[in-house]
Amino acid sequence: MIIGIGVDIIEIERVRQAIQNNKNFLSKLFTERELDYFISRNMNSEVIAGNFAAKEAVSKALGTGIRGFSFKDIEILRNELGKPEVILHNGANLIGNKLVGNNNSLRVHLSISHNNSSAIAYSVLEGEYYGNM
């Protein structure tokens, strides 16, 4: 059963400027494994913006936005085929598990895309729904 959906779109230039103007921008929002991925992609602004939009989309699918946890609690990685995968940690994991009654049925689906100016991400949470947050 679908228990949450979220979408986010961001201007890539805004992310590019945030990286240039705030030396802590990346380390505040992304895990070491995400940063390693960005390095492997030559710190491509489109990739970074896509991951940022993905974190926002997942937080919206959880129904909370970024409340009760940090950006780093939503980790966006890629599998061997390049498909984005979501790993929830700490507060985000607690919220996700609460949605499914701690029955380990939560699955997070994610799609990320971009063009020259914007990055977009769409997330769907699937699992056995157990009620209100």
Curated annotation (Swiss-Prot):
Q: List GO BP terms, alphabetically.
A: fatty acid biosynthetic process
- Where is it localised? Cytoplasm
Which Pfam families does this entry report, sorted A to Z? ACPS
Q: Where does Mg(2+) bind?
A: D8, E56
User: Which NCBIfam families does UniProt cross-reference here?
Assistant: acpS (TIGR00516), pantethn_trn (TIGR00556)
InterPro entries, per this entry? Answer: 4-PPantetheinyl_Trfase_dom, 4-PPantetheinyl_Trfase_dom_sf, ACPS, Ppantetheine-prot_Trfase_dom
Q: What's in the keyword line of the UniProt record? A: Cytoplasm, Fatty acid biosynthesis, Fatty acid metabolism, Lipid biosynthesis, Lipid metabolism, Magnesium, Metal-binding, Transferase
Gene behind this protein: acpS
State the family named in the UniProt similarity comment for this chain: Belongs to the P-Pant transferase superfamily. AcpS family.
Molecular functions per Gene Ontology: holo-[acyl-carrier-protein] synthase activity; magnesium ion binding
Cofactor dependency: Mg(2+)
Give the protein's function.
Transfers the 4'-phosphopantetheine moiety from coenzyme A to a Ser of acyl-carrier-protein.
Which domain of life does this protein belong to?
Bacteria
Name recorded for this polypeptide: Holo-[acyl-carrier-protein] synthase
Q: What HAMAP family has UniProt attached to this entry?
A: AcpS
Which principal EC class is assigned to this enzyme?
Answer: transferase
Q: Give the catalytic activity.
A: apo-[ACP] + CoA = holo-[ACP] + adenosine 3',5'-bisphosphate + H(+)
Q: What is its EC number?
A: 2.7.8.7
Give the source species.
Clostridium perfringens (strain 13 / Type A)
Cellular-component GO terms for this entry: cytoplasm
